[in-house]
Regions:
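Charged, often glycine-rich, active-site loop that binds/positions anionic groups
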Residues: 59-79
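Glycine-rich phosphate/diphosphate-binding loops that line cofactor/substrate pockets in enzymes
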Residues: 48-52, 56, 82-92, 276-290
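Short acidic, glycine/serine/threonine-rich loops at helix termini
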Residues: 6-10, 66-69, 104-106, 137-142, ...
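Active-site histidine-anchored catalytic micro-motif
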Residues: 3-6, 70-77, 84-177, 289, ...
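Conserved anion/nucleotide-ligand pocket segment
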Residues: 162, 170-210
């Protein structure tokens, strides 16, 4: 998932480590992911059987950031394509994201699918699952026999998307011919926070999709897109597959359903201090924590998870019983480990990404607890995933607890707080560096959820990005200004 405005590129080592995703695995080791809530896990479970031989090549995913380096793309893509070269496969499945922009190619997944098609030929079906935030391109649609997107955000149905992809592949193998395909592109960009399927209008949109799919006997997908990739095919797409040309009408109807509700996709945001003041007022009469999304520094959208705007707001507002995480600062984590728990350290925390309006936070912090950064997710988003955030620590400043780590991980699972000794259920205010994924595990314990617009590389309002290459006429937000080529 490429944020072309983000400060840090994505290199090969980022894919090796994984971070937001499991670490890179090859060959038979891929099959061990069958029980993880990701598409490849659902696909494996759905395809297993005495008459099916699964031949995995490689699986790798990197925490979202800026452009994927050419070296990383070419090394990993070559492994995938070479694994299919000269083999007599019946079908090919890819677990993709769908919003990769490389240094040398705007459409990483399209390039990979096209290269695979050139190797396996026109008769071997290629099916891929995509993230809900995919920027679906013409090349992707033309190179694959079927693309299947998630339907939930937070992405609780990742494995289900893999199962749906397996079902389509089985049907393609049985019928021996491609389905009719139709696709429509939305005329406006949707803010990331507006895509949450736990609330309207996204919840109703995916309900309408499921009803149309069932009633018409077709396969439908809607990817609202990732509105932080500056290239002409950025944005939402509705597409589907059917036995005949009727699929054109089904796709057109769902697109009209979405566009007719354009005003509902508008999202309100709070300034940092305003968000903290509201949280304090709510928390004063609540028994559960108020959760604030520090959405513009979401590492799941290209942020480095080290901006300090929300920390400053918590301190300035003298918040009590507050926690913020993850603050990614390897130097601060090392200083905490060198000093030891119970000691004070005077450091410049975070603010290292050169984001406009952001700067390091200079203060003397108390080291409350140290951690090796190991965490196993128990929440519904990626239940069972193990992550290693590197040397980590819980620092305190007044009534604020700061969970500092060495490596990036989106604060989407309560155990990321617990690994540093914060019990999230006992806090009054939680500030999560996340946009929506945190809701899967935190909404059940939250008195209220607020969205703050502190400085960060993932602009919550797409119209705030300095676009140069969007499709002419694209509205930069729902009911917003129209993009004009500079």
């Amino acid at each position: 998932e490429t944020n072309t405005f983000a400060p840090s590129k994505t290199d090969y080592d980022d894919f090796v480590r994984g971070g937001a995703f499991p670490a890179m695995v090859r060959g038979a080791d891929v099959l061990a992911m069958r029980d993880v809530n990701i598409p490849i896990g659902g696909f494996i479970r759905a395809m297993e059987g005495p008459r099916t031989e699964l031949v995995p090549a490689i699986w790798a995913g990197a925490t979202p950031a800026a452009h994927v380096t050419r070296e990383a793309f070419e090394r990993i893509a070559a492994e995938i394509v070479d694994a299919a070269r000269g083999k007599d496969f019946d079908g090919v499945y890819l677990d993709l994201h769908g919003a990769m922009v490389c240094e040398h190619d705007d459409d990483g997944e399209g390039a990979l699918l096209a290269a695979l098609r050139a190797v396996v030929g026109p008769r071997v079906p290629i099916v891929a699952s995509l993230d809900l935030h995919a920027n679906v391109t013409r090349r992707m649609l033309e190179s694959a026999d079927a693309l299947v997107a998630y339907r939930t955000y937070p992405h609780e149905d990742m494995a289900e998307a893999g199962e749906r992809a397996a079902g389509l592949l089985k049907r393609l193998l049985t019928r021996g011919t491609r389905y009719h395909r139709a696709a429509r592109r939305l005329p406006f960009l949707i803010p990331i926070n507006g895509m949450c399927t736990m609330v309207e209008p996204a919840r109703g949109t995916y309900g309408a999709l499921a009803r149309a799919e069932s009633a018409q006997g077709v396969a439908l997908s809607f990817a609202p897109g990732f509105p932080a990739a500056d290239f002409p095919e950025c944005g939402g797409v509705v597409w589907g597959y059917g036995d005949d040309a009727r699929i054109e009408g089904v796709v057109a109807d769902l697109t009209d359903y979405i566009v007719s509700r354009e005003a509902q996709w508008v999202v309100p945001f709070l300034e940092p201090e305003e968000a903290v003041r509201q949280a304090q007022a709510i928390a004063a009469r609540a028994t559960k924590p108020v959760v604030i999304a520090d959405t513009q520094d979401n590492p799941g959208g290209g942020g480095d998870s080290n901006t300090t705007g929300m920390l400053r707001a918590l301190v300035k507002c003298e918040a009590q019983g507050a926690a913020i995480g993850l603050m990614v600062d390897g130097a601060a984590a090392r200083a905490a480990h060198e000093a030891g728990a119970g000691h004070d350290i005077t450091i410049a925390l975070g603010g290292q990404s050169g984001v406009d309006g952001d700067a390091p936070f200079h203060a003397t912090f108390r080291v409350e607890q140290l951690s090796d950064g190991y965490c196993r997710y128990d929440g519904p988003m990626m239940n069972g995933k193990e992550t290693h955030a590197g040397p980590s620590a819980r620092l305190s400043l007044g009534g604020v607890q700061i969970v500092v780590s060495t490596y990036k991980d989106q604060m989407l699972d309560r155990n990321l707080y617990r690994m540093a000794g914060v019990q999230p259920e006992e806090m009054k205010i939680l500030v999560n560096k996340s946009s929506v994924h945190f809701r899967a595990d935190f909404q059940p314990i939250a008195e209220a959820i607020l969205v703050a617009k502190a400085p960060g590389p993932l602009r919550a309002d797409p119209a705030d990005f300095p676009w140069t290459r969007l499709a002419p006429g694209m509205r930069l937000r729902p009911l917003g200004p129209v993009f004009k080529t500079p």
